[in-house]
A protein has these predicted regions:
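DNA major-groove recognition helix of helix-turn-helix
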Residues: 106, 118, 155-157, 168
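Short, hydrophobic/aromatic alpha-helical segments in well-folded domains
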Residues: 76-77, 126, 152-155
Length: 174
């Protein structure tokens, strides 16, 4: 498995505490596990058969999530930002922190600010709908919080580098 690559996805608020550093430092980068967590990297030596590698990856994932608790405030914030009408100022007030603190905590635990988190969550809702076989792009756009289908198209191009129709086709919908 020399040169093999993998990725980790954390639920909002869990990545920073699990890795022990602000995720904003890792955004848009490929980082070697040995640079982040040498002890865990040693669990994944160079050449493994696929079954052993999969077991070790699951072990590493379990250790990463066990290393530190998620920022529960950010987890709550991500649920609130799932509402496309939510505003950062209102969410911060609901959680009992300033808007500036909200931005900092989001950057540290998620890797980007609340507005970008809201965009990502909206895009994930769109992808979930097309994965479920929904092909009415205009209806999906309205349902998940885009102002119109053109807004969905711009955001899809930015997030995935594809039009919504092409993304749906590649994911098996439509």
């Amino acid at each position: 498995m020399a040169g093999a690559r993998g990725a980790a996805r954390f639920r909002p608020g869990a990545g920073g505490p699990a890795l022990g550093l602000p995720l904003s430092e890792l955004r848009d980068q490929r980082v070697d596990l040995a640079d982040l967590h040498p002890a865990l990297a040693r669990l994944l030596p160079g050449t493994l058969d696929l079954k052993t590698a999969a077991g070790r990856v699951l072990d590493v994932a379990g250790r990463l999530t066990a290393d530190g608790p998620a920022d529960n405030a950010v987890a709550h914030v991500s649920r609130m930002l799932g509402d496309p009408r939510a505003r950062a100022e209102d969410v911060a007030g609901e959680v009992g922190i300033s808007t500036r603190q909200l931005r900092r905590r989001c950057h540290d635990t998620v890797g980007y600010g609340p507005k970008t988190l809201q965009r990502v969550l909206r895009f994930r809702r769109f992808v979930s709908r097309i994965d479920a076989g929904d092909v009415d792009l205009a209806a999906i756009a309205a349902d998940v919080g885009y102002s119109d289908q053109a807004h969905l198209t711009r955001e899809c191009a930015e997030m995935a580098g594809l039009t919504p129709a092409v993304l749906a086709r590649l994911r098996g919908a439509g």
